[in-house]
Amino acid sequence: MTESKRPRVMVDMSATLIHHGHIRLLKKAAEIGEVVVALTSDEEVKKTKGYVPELNFEERKEILEGIKYVSEVVSCPWLITEDFMKSQHCDLLVHGADNSNHIPAEKLIIFPRTEGISSSMLRERVLDSLIEMNLDDPKHSRASDKVARFLIESIKKEFRIDQKRTSLSPYGRGRQGRPQQES
């Protein structure tokens, strides 16, 4: 008697700042089959999202390879095609609810996003923390103040944040920088 082969499941992501939502998605995918992460390159992220990832491709790849649910990490284009899936010998594509890939429904599994977390939200939390640290704690040295101000200004420029704002909304931004709809 032969054991039936588990499907190879592709999970595409940019994972610019890896968080527990990514881990949960990978865990769910691993329940279905062998997980192949299709990771977008730094160039694809810059071209599509408009910024350079905080962690470069090799750093993101190394982190993902260290996750027990992941069998393999491959570089991928922004949009996954059936041909790309075939080239990686994958049977299914798993994606979050923000899917824009053009894969037939029978080969696509959509999982809802993890509430309350996204890479964009992490960026906002870092910025808010830097602002709070810089404004509220007089113990910080001039050097740390300079670093904090530099980082704040860099983040504001990179993400085109209104220069007059001193705090950010707790809500993330959707694909292509559009605010997400609240439900």
Could you say what each language-model-derived stretch is?
Residues M1-S129:
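Nucleotidyltransferase catalytic core that binds NTPs
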Residues L17-H20, L135, K139-R142, R178-Q180:
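A short glycine-/small-residue-rich loop at the edge of a beta-strand within enzyme catalytic domains
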Residues G21, E59, K139, A143, ...:
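A generic structural signal for residues located within well-ordered alpha-helices
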Residues E132-S141, S154, R160:
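Nucleotide/phosphate-binding catalytic cleft detector across ATP-hydrolyzing
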Residues D145-K156:
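Amphipathic, well-packed alpha-helical segments that form the structural scaffold of globular domains
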Residues F159-S183:
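Divalent metal-dependent catalytic cores for phosphoryl transfer on phosphate-bearing substrates
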